[in-house]
Regions:
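Core catalytic region of metal-dependent phosphoesterases/phosphodiesterases
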Residues: 2-5, 9, 14-114
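Conserved catalytic motifs of the protein kinase core domain
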Residues: 5, 43, 117, 200, ...
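Residue-level detector of flexible, active-site-proximal loop/helix-junction positions
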Residues: 13, 112, 228, 240, ...
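Conserved beta-sheet core of the metallophosphoesterase superfamily
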Residues: 104-107, 120, 125, 131-139, ...
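Structural motif
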Residues: 114-115, 237
Length: 258
């Protein structure tokens, strides 16, 4: 990989103001991280919930995020592939980002191989057994008829409503989350998957709890954390996965490695 790294981040929730800063301040911070990452990145994976709410019409998209869009376009134009994954907050990405920014858009988990190591990469929501209420909600959100009906609403109302719902959903739950180990549904999903196929790493967002957790058969589960409370990301350096906390203008803090 010629000393280049693969970068992973998720759950940035752009557009969401928090106790640690305005939405614009967090966007600027993430753009600063992108500036650092592009120096030695071979690829960048943004693994879902990039936006706190996103819904694009055929000819209308939400305003804002100008700095973020500009930097992503610049990185793609420089020859570094950038991958966007839909999450549960931005499931309504369609063709705007591939056409305008040149990113690769993924609606489902993908499998990639880096230096002979197989990676299973996705946002992580709705995988495995259980959580049937959320799975039903996701089916509703991805239903093409219901999407068409929602698109009949004027953007002034639909985007206001979507943002209000998203913020309410976020603050109705704990933003921070403590990972529960093998009892987590996502860990159970990964271990069950390993019964049928070998992987070295499962890389997910969604849980907002940065951790590298050991699985069966020497595999690892990497949960990327978030950019609301933790400001974390992961890199694959060709040998190991590194989970780090971004600290602007300082050396980033290594949280875990494996």
């Amino acid at each position: 990989m010629n000393n280049q790294k693969v970068y992973f981040a998720s759950d940035i929730h752009l557009g969401l103001p928090t106790q640690k800063g305005s939405a614009l301040a967090r966007e600027k911070l993430f753009v600063k991280w992108l500036d650092e990452a592009k120096k030695d990145a071979s690829e960048i994976f943004l693994v879902g919930d990039i936006f706190d709410f996103w819904y694009e019409y055929k000819r209308v998209v939400p305003k804002g995020f100008t700095r973020f869009f500009g930097r992503i376009a610049e990185i793609v134009d420089s020859g570094i592939p950038v991958h966007f994954f839909t999450g549960n907050h931005d499931v309504w990405m369609f063709d705007y980002f591939p056409k305008e920014l040149g990113v690769e858009l993924h609606r489902k988990p993908i499998v990639r191989v880096f230096n002979g190591k197989k990676f299973f990469i996705g946002h992580g929501d709705g995988l495995g057994k259980g959580d049937y209420g959320y799975k039903l909600l996701k089916l509703i959100f991805t239903n093409r008829v219901l999407q068409w009906l929602f698109s009949r609403l004027h953007p002034n109302f639909s985007l206001w409503f979507g943002n209000r719902w998203s913020v309410s959903s976020r603050y109705s739950k704990y933003i921070t989350y403590k990972f529960k180990g093998d009892s987590e549904l996502i860990a159970q999903f990964a271990n069950t998957t390993l019964d049928d196929e070998m992987y070295s790493y499962f890389v997910f967002g969604h849980w907002h709890a940065p951790v590298i957790h050991p699985l069966k058969n020497s595999a690892k589960l990497v949960v990327l954390g978030d950019w609301i409370e933790n400001f974390t990301y992961a890199t694959w350096d060709g040998e190991l996965m590194n989970l780090l906390r971004y600290i602007p203008n300082e050396n980033d803090e290594l949280l875990a490695q494996g």
